[in-house]
Swiss-Prot record:
Implicated in a number of adherence functions. OPA proteins are implicated in pathogenesis and are subject to phase variation. Pfam families: Opacity (PF02462). SUPFAM superfamilies: OMPA-like (SSF56925). GO terms for molecular function: porin activity. It is found in: Cell outer membrane. Residues 1 form the signal peptide. It comes from the Bacteria. One of its GO terms (cellular component) is cell outer membrane. The lineage of its organism: Bacteria, Pseudomonadati, Pseudomonadota, Betaproteobacteria, Neisseriales. Belongs to the opacity porin family. This is Opacity protein opA52. InterPro entries: OMP/PagP_b-brl, Porin_opacity. Keywords: Cell outer membrane, Membrane, Signal, Transmembrane, Transmembrane beta strand.
């Protein structure tokens, strides 16, 4: 609100720091949905990340109560995972002219995952009440309904092959044979790209400080629950600093 306690339309621009948190919500192993296949990959379980993003709002100040529509875009989250698992399949002692030779056969499995998660945008409508402590200092609280758009994708490749290591005895270097059973090699590729739109709810609190007629400095916090994204739940905590101008 402006310094003159008047009413009128306003615009607001904020820079927000968002803490983004995804938690798992899998079907009960003994429940009715135990066989349900997840469409949000296990890759995205328990993500905790953050982003800095702009937010713009337009609203109307009724002289105590305010309503506003806001729009924000968030940063895309990237992560890569690579793992190798080596399992012994068999070992044999072979007699050679040079002595004993130990051959050990292994199965090598490589797993590469590349994932992205993007809270693309949030369009919200909020109702806010300003507490008029004095002519300059106005704490506020509010509630918000938001329509959020989230995209997530994963590109996973799993390769399995057999190798052989021959140990020739003490003091000699072992010999490594790569890909000894090419006919038994396996390569599994899994790609998933999803887009979800959900209606969520949140709350906000902060303080406005009038610095000039019609111009207010705003420092705020807001929590938003984006809704259930298949087998996960997504929420954000945001701290913001901005300016509001009432016409």
């Amino acid at each position: 609100a402006g310094e003159d306690h008047g009413r009128g339309p306003y615009v607001q621009a904020d820079l927000a720091y968002a803490y983004e948190h995804i938690t798992r919500d899998y079907p009960d192993a003994a429940g009715a949905n135990k066989g349900k296949i997840s469409t949000v990959s296990d890759y995205f379980r328990n993500i905790r990340t953050h982003s800095i993003h702009p937010r713009v709002s337009v609203g109307y100040d009724f002289g105590g109560w305010r309503i506003a529509a806001d729009y924000a875009r968030y940063r895309k989250w990237h992560n890569n995972k690579y793992s190798v698992n080596i399992k012994e399949l068999e070992r044999k002692n072979n007699k050679t002219s040079g002595g004993d030779q130990l051959n050990i056969k292994y199965q090598k499995t490589e797993h590469q995952e590349n994932g992205t998660f993007h809270a693309v945008s949030s369009l919200g409508l909020s109702t806010v009440y300003d507490f008029r402590v004095n002519d300059k200092f106005k704490p506020y609280i509010g509630v918000r309904v938001g329509y959020g758009h989230v995209r997530h994708g994963i590109d996973s490749t799993k390769k399995t092959k057999n190798t052989l290591t021959a140990y020739h005895g003490a003091g000699t270097k072992p010999t490594y044979y790569d890909d000894i059973d090419s006919g038994k090699n396996q390569k599994n590729t899994y790609r998933q790209n999803r887009s979800s739109r959900r209606l969520g709810f949140g709350a906000m609190a902060g303080v406005g400080i009038d610095v000039a007629p019609g111009l207010t400095l705003d420092a705020g916090y807001r929590y938003h629950y984006w809704g259930r994204l298949e087998n996960t739940r997504f929420k954000t905590h945001e701290a913001s600093l901005g300016v509001r101008y009432r016409f």
